[in-house]
Amino acid sequence: MKASELRDKDVAGLNQELSELLKAQFGLRMQKATQQLQNTSQLKKVRRDIARVRTVLGQKGNQK
C-alpha cells in the first residue's frame, strides 16, 4: 500500500490496517518457522507496510 493512500485514511482506519498487517506478519513468521513459506519476500513487504502505517500514524499525531 502506498503512503499517499494511507494519508487519506483516518486514524481508526490506520489502526485497523496496522492490526491486520501485524496478524499477517505473525502468520508469515509461523509459516517460515515451519518451513511452509514459499515466497519469503512477503515478510519484507509486510514489514515495510507496517512501517509505512506507523509513520503516517505518527505524522497524524504530530499534526494535532
UniProtKB/Swiss-Prot annotation:
The keyword Isomerase does not apply. It comes from the Bacteria. The gene is rpmC. It comes from Ralstonia pickettii (strain 12J). One of its GO terms (cellular component) is cytosolic large ribosomal subunit. Keywords: Ribonucleoprotein, Ribosomal protein. SUPFAM superfamilies: Ribosomal protein L29 (L29p). GO terms for molecular function: structural constituent of ribosome. Belongs to the universal ribosomal protein uL29 family. GO terms for biological process: translation. This is Large ribosomal subunit protein uL29. The keyword Transferase does not apply.
